[in-house]
Amino acid sequence: DEEYLMESNEEAFRLDVKTDIESVEKQALWAGIKPGMRVADIGCGSGKTTAILHNLVQPGGVVVGVDGSEKRIIYAQDHYAAQGIKFICKDIREPLGDLGLFDLVWVRFLLEYYLSNSSDIVENISEIVKPGGILCLIDLDHNCLNYCGLPPKLERTIFAAMRVLGEKANFDPYAGRRLYSYLYKLGYQDIDVNVSAHHLIFGRLRDSDAFNWMKKIEVVSRKVNYQFEEYKGGYEEFLNEFMRFFTDPGRFVYT
């Protein structure tokens, strides 16, 4: 049974740090969230997004956060428990019918970790959307692959590493472009699409971006045991060059 790519003792904290309240609210309102709704947050992680969605369905709404990690469900319960919020540990690849039906099912930054089976996962999740309800899929496209000012050796290494992630860790850096087709093939009506930048990094590096990207590089490099062949000093030399680029206020990065 494959392990979640970003699994680490600090993953719940990383998810908390990187989750921007304003962005989640804007996306949820665009998707059609309203007071009184029953909402499922699939792949809820730390529970921060679940709490944001809960605020948007008040008065009278409830949100169920679902995640496959018992550790993150405990973290979510410790940090975001409230009346009208329930957290459940469950494998989202297995049947979800016992959760009941929902007015809105929210799936954000989850499918990128399931390159080979994301279509099946969406079909499974779709079973808990009530007739006339909303299934909102949000994910990144060309993930961690858009840079200006990247030294050639660093660029080759990053692109090669992303290919290895697809081969060894079921990771999909192009998940975003596939979302429309999933909904279309399942027969959804009134499908709408919105495309915007998620990572948008220029000028002074924010502490939250520095922590998030450092943690991603650290965890992913260890998980897939990637060999930094162009760097005689291996991972440490690669990391030093990446951080010189990433902390330079003249660089530009977006996803």
List each language-model region with its residue ranges.
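Conserved alpha-helix/loop element of class I SAM-dependent methyltransferases that forms part
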Residues: 18-37, 52
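A short acidic, Gly/Pro-enriched loop at the edge of an enzyme's catalytic core
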Residues: 96-105
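Conserved catalytic/acceptor-binding region of the Class I
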Residues: 136-205
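Class I SAM-dependent methyltransferase SAM/SAH-binding core
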Residues: 40, 46-95, 120
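Class I SAM-dependent methyltransferase Rossmann-like catalytic core
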Residues: 2-22
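Conserved Class I S-adenosyl-L-methionine
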Residues: 192-255
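Helix-to-beta-strand junctions that scaffold the AdoMet/dcAdoMet cofactor pocket
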Residues: 58, 114-115, 129-131
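A short glycine-rich, Lys/Arg-flanked "PGG" loop and its adjoining helix->strand segment in the class I
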Residues: 119-134
